[in-house]
Amino acid sequence: MAGSHVDMAPASTTEGTGEKPGPTAPAPTPAAQYECGECGKSFRWSSRLLHHQRTHTGERPYKCPDCPKAFKGSSALLYHQRGHTGERPYQCPDCPKAFKRSSLLQIHRSVHTGLRAFTCGQCGLAFKWSSHYQYHLRQHTGERPYPCPDCPKAFKNSSSLRRHRHVHTGERPYTCGICGKSFTQSTNLRQHQRVHTGERPFRCPLCPKTFTHSSNLLLHHRTHGPAPGPAPAPAPPGETSRADTKVLVSDAYLQPRSPPEPPAPPPQPPPVVPELFLAAAETTVELVYRCDGCEQGFSSEELLLEHQPCPGPPVATQSQDVPAELPQADSALPQPPPATPGPPNFACLPCGKSFRTVAGLSRHQHSHGAASGQAFRCGSCDGAFPQLASLLAHQQCHVEEAAAGRPPPQAEVAEVTCPQEPVAPATPAPPPPPPPAPVVSAERPYKCAECGKAFKGSSGLRYHLRDHTGERPYQCGECGKAFKRSSLLAIHQRVHTGLRAFTCGQCGLTFKWSSHYQYHLRLHSGERPYACTECGKAFRNTSCLRRHRHVHTGERPHSCSVCGKSFAQTSNLRQHQRVHTGERPFRCPLCPKTFTHSSNLLLHQRTHSAERPFACPICGRGFVMAAYLQRHLRTHTPATTTSGTTGSAVASQPPAPLAAAPTPLAAQDVHVLPNLQATLSLEVAGGTAQPTPPGPAAPSSQTFLLVQTAQGLQLIPSSVQSPTPPPPPPPPKVILLPPASAGGPGSGAARPGPRSVGKAGQGTGVVWFPGPGGLGLQGGANAGASGGGQSLIVLQNVGSGETGPQEVSGVQLQPAQEVATVQLQPAQEVTTVQLQPAQEVTTVQLQPLTGQVSNSNGGAGTTEAPNLLLVQSGATEELLTGPGPGEVGDSEAGAGVVQDVLFETLQTDEGLQSVLVLSGADGEQTRLCVQEVETLSPGLAEPAATGPSGQKLLIIRSAPATDLLENSSVAGGTTTLQLLAPSAPGPVSAPVGVPVAPPSQMVQVVPAVAGPGVMAPQNLPSIQIVQTLPAVQLVHTF
């Protein structure tokens, strides 16, 4: 900082005259008169002593009105205010640069003059600035006179202490005007602003890559490795550069080097290190200054001075040859032997371990300590030092000599070999052979002693060590979350502010973090700069590459503490731990289901929409997951079928049509039925098994099972694992009670025509439609004793108005109004229905109903015309067609007899569905979709049975459809059924003693084949199968 510079005389520890350094070293000053009582430092003037004492007291009485900064002296405040106003009154006569202080101009002039007036008496290093000279002296003495009042740390200068105090105070006075990010130093703010401006001033001389920071460029240089070609010759003494200062020079001033010449052997260690000076003719050289203590780069000396870095004086050097006429230092430095080729390193003498950087050696040697007086010995000469800092300062002379003879990409890094034994200076070493071609590998010289992880920079290792110690010094003031880096805290705070400062110029997306913004830009450009060295696969960022490398290394460093399972990424471990904790944080907004992974939620949401991205190439059916598609494709593979009478019997003569239906598609597949609360046993069989007539062969045959699973009742192939569909809403209930009494099963075929109601068997079931006409169907108690135990399929509804019954030709049904409820009541008290397993259905017949129906008040109701489709066993010879005990005249309905019943799976407008096929005598078929299977309500008791058990019950109804005709548009002709929404609640008329079913349903008749001007329905009709046997199996072959 500006207020922290104190011009000190280089020859003593007393305060200098205050004059700016001239071209030569200042002369010795008279003895000091004023001494500091805290540290013993002496000053010539009391004002200097007073200014110095504020260093110990921390007093800063001069505060800036524009920012929170305060200073110990008024002159420092004056210079600081020029930073706000932009005033720079002191301009360099050799270049266009201007400065706000005359001392800064004098310091800058040393770049052109090359003067280094301050020379260390212990190691010979020379400095341009007295503040850096004083800082360097403390490296020899180990003095750290500026302790932190909040922690045990101490620092060599006040600026380092001020920067450290920001860790405790959290002060960040410099704020970015674009994204609001704040910084402790103005130089950091300027560097950050390059993220928004896109400025990347540091270009690699070996590849087209550019960087925003010089330190990033230096790290990038390591990936190129040693440059090919012969090693350059060591520079003359006047060209020796300080290698601990990392400085880059623009490409325009990089000159080719001359062939190497063997230097003369050095007689003894050098006492003085001459410095590199730049001639005034090269005033346009753009130098980039880098702080050696914290590896931060700067574009000018002024910024570097404001930064006031940690260890290491910032000296600008060049990587190219310097003209011979440059001024030299007072004494020449004999050159050591050239460094041997190979990777340079620093060697620890006590244990022989080598390090690539001085910092690595410094950290390592702290483990040995300084037990003896001369514990730290130089590996290149016989010098020994009591402190590590003194040894490091001494080794700079060897570093400079080696750096002068290295290629430009490596010249800025202080890495040389300090051998255990001195090199014999007998004969000059021959020129080394050309080094191998550069190896592109990310060098990571900073290794963690705890886990072995390596890093490119010391800052990365420092942050990593906090993972082991648990230190998180940066805490969010909003939520209390703590972080190990201040930059991570600033990124986190955008969660509270919502600031998204990075906007894509191509698509307009905004981002909170620059890393996500850079990654997004590569989506547009297609750039994948990070390639795997094992397989060549490229990635958009380094984190993706690191995760990919686990595939080759097999590393799985993150283990579950509960079950021991290991993972390559922490995110996978967190997801796995939800298995143990039961956490399911992702909830579907349309249903109550929750999931452990967001991807599973996305897949689930497809079940609520029409999205089916995985389509079957054979039948076109879509699936929400690829796994479901693979499972479905197995159904197209030919499989062994189960032979038997079930589903295999086909009528020998083509039966008459029962009802026309839309022509089904040829594709077949499994249709999963909706949920069911009980187990079902149902076998569907045709008549007597007969040979299949010749015809086109089916594409494949498969045996299917209707089984009760944890997800509901499902119809699946016997060799395929059933999928797990989402449970649909519970279907509406329709109650159908079969007959209670039974007669012995006979073997005679059913009569083709109906008999009168009076001749029907006893114990028939009851169908009740409490609609407008109060229609009911009830078997008489004193009916004839010829067969019994019939089962009913309800096909028709009440007629409209006073219209009488109509004859049924094929199946021609009267236009329907609506049926409110369907109820079944036994002739006597029936509480339980027991069904006999596996009996064949031989005849299905459709007949009209005539006669009057009594309502609940005993009066005669309107004449209705229901059509009842009866499925009966072979033993039954009489068909029940009327609701009452009265006699009804015979009517011929032979065309309605169904000769065969079988199942198949067809493609409909609503997808693949299981279809009941009813074959008529004329060869035409009617297909009815199996929509649902239900059981009767429990709690019913069965009366004593005097005959065989009742047969299976089938209720035929249609599936929901969207394109249905209104009742007014229904014309005459063949009709099918449609189940509508429940009717409005209200009183329902019913005969005396007949219970009313709570869920009332509506039935509508629509034409199956469109007439002129009438649109045909888009869906097949459906059947509802009701069964109560507890055994579990529905097997049908098709």
UniProtKB/Swiss-Prot annotation:
| Positions annotated as sequence repeat | 811-821, 822-832, 833-843, 844-854
PROSITE patterns (UniProt xref):
ZINC_FINGER_C2H2_1, ZINC_FINGER_C2H2_2
* Compartments, record wording: Nucleus
Q: Does the keyword Lipoprotein apply?
A: no
Which Pfam families does the UniProt record give? zf-C2H2
- Per the record, GO CC terms? nucleus
- Can the keyword 4Fe-4S be found in this entry's annotation? no
Q: Where is the composition biased (Pro residues)?
A: 227-237, 257-273, 723-733
Expression (tissue specificity): Expressed widely in testis, in both germline and somatic cells. Seems to have particularly strong expression in meiotic spermatocytes, postmeiotic round spermatids and Sertoli cells. Not detected in elongating spermatids or mature sperm (at protein level). Expressed in testis, ovary, spleen, lung, brain, liver and kidney. Expressed in D3 embryonic stem cells and F9 embryonal carcinoma cells.
**Which residue stretches are annotated zinc finger (C2H2-type)?**
34-56, 62-84, 90-112, 118-140, 146-168, 174-196, 202-224, 346-368, 376-398, 446-468, 474-496, 502-524, 530-552, 558-580, 586-608, 614-636
The effect of disrupting this gene, in the record's words, is:
Viable, with no gross morphological or behavioral phenotypes. Males are infertile with complete absence of mature sperm. Spermiogenesis arrests at the round spermatid stage, accompanied by extensive apoptosis within the seminiferous tubules. Expression of spermiogenesis-associated genes TNP1, TNP2, PRM1 and PRM2 in testis is significantly reduced.
Keywords in alphabetical order, please: DNA-binding, Metal-binding, Nucleus, Phosphoprotein, Repeat, Transcription, Transcription regulation, Zinc, Zinc-finger
> Which InterPro entries does the UniProt entry name for this protein?
Znf_C2H2-type, Znf_C2H2_sf, Znf_C2H2_type
> What segment(s) does the record annotate as region Interaction with TAF4B?
922-1038
Quote the biased-composition stretches of kind Low complexity, using this chain's numbering. 13-22, 734-756
Identify this protein by name.
Answer: Zinc finger protein 628
Source organism per entry reads: Mus musculus (Mouse)
